[in-house]
Amino acid sequence: MVSAYLLANFGGPRHSNDIEVFLTSLLTDRDVTGGFLPSFIHKRLFSFIAKKRALKVLPQYNCIGGFSPIYQDTELLAETLSSHLDAPVITFHRYLPDTHPHTIQQLKTLGDFPIVGVPLFPHFTYAVTGSIVRFIHNQLPLLNISWVSHFGNHPEFISCMMDHILKFLQSHDISTHDCCLLFSAHGLPMRHVNKGDPYNMQCEKSFRAISERLPNIETHLCYQSKFGPGKWLSPSTKDLCATLKTDKKHVLIVPFGFTSDHIETLYEIEKEYIAVLIDKGYQALRVPAIYQSSQWVESLATIIQSTPHVEKKSLIKS
């Protein structure tokens, strides 16, 4: 019997003072940025990049209220989910390092009782879910924990996404025959894909499963948030918005793989990509992340309880 669940998310700045700390924690993570540099050089280089980038994104955070809602949304989700699972739900915010000691202490108190880790990412990548698993394993190597590695093709996720999209269309009086949906997932460098990361295959499979159940709607899969040099998964959301040609009047961008809204949905999609589509003459809107769905908590509980749990060794890239 599971004694507790670990609900893991990206984390995000709770206020402006968190921005540089958050970015430093993110960019110095070698599962994310990789590289062949010695550890101390890698850390110094990406700490410098994080400091510069923090200045660039500060106005973007100010534009969405000065913080990311992902931290609070994850905390509230854990509270609600606990009653559905009838067990404690502990939160882990990967790139908010000041929250880690409390999480580690909570996990330590569970001793050898079984725990299930639940990264809130539908599609697995070593750069995100793998990083979460590695961190927890490094901190608590003897922890009795198994993981929900991905759920992007789970019937409950597909059903919840469809319900969420169709309710949004209905609430905005948009016909399924007159809209085009851009499913925007987070991008990934091709160097990860070429080394066997299954992320893009899972995204494509999940996208097809949803599209097949929406036969009257034009759909496209794209990838956003490219950072740094090198080739990434394509097409990019930015390029697709710029080149899109459709006879549909309404174009909606659906956060795909983002279960919570944050800077990449509230600013990148809302303020940048939607503006491009509007300039092209479309009536464009951003669909909120699935967190806003009334069905989400119940669906997630079902996913957690019905998905085979995976041991850590298969989730960490050597």
Swiss-Prot record:
Keyword annotations for this protein?
Cytoplasm, Heme biosynthesis, Iron, Lyase, Metal-binding, Porphyrin biosynthesis
GO cellular component terms, A-Z: cytoplasm
Q: Which NCBIfam families match?
A: hemH (TIGR00109)
PANTHER family reported for this sequence: FERROCHELATASE, FERROCHELATASE, MITOCHONDRIAL
The family note in this entry says:
Belongs to the ferrochelatase family.
Function summary: Catalyzes the ferrous insertion into protoporphyrin IX.
| Annotated InterPro entries | Ferrochelatase, Ferrochelatase_AS, Ferrochelatase_C, Ferrochelatase_N
Checking CDD domains in the record gives:
Ferrochelatase_C, Ferrochelatase_N
Q: List the protein's name.
A: Ferrochelatase
* EC class name: lyase
Q: In which pathway does it act?
A: Porphyrin-containing compound metabolism; protoheme biosynthesis; protoheme from protoporphyrin-IX: step 1/1
GO function terms (MF aspect): ferrochelatase activity; metal ion binding
Which sequence ranges form a coiled-coil region, renumbered to this chain?
A: none
- Disulfide pattern: none
* Compartmental location: Cytoplasm
| Enzyme nomenclature, EC number | 4.98.1.1
Describe the reaction catalysed, as an equation: heme b + 2 H(+) = protoporphyrin IX + Fe(2+)
Q: Which domain of life is it from?
A: Bacteria
- Residues the entry annotates as binding Fe cation: 186, 264
Biological process terms in GO annotation: heme biosynthetic process
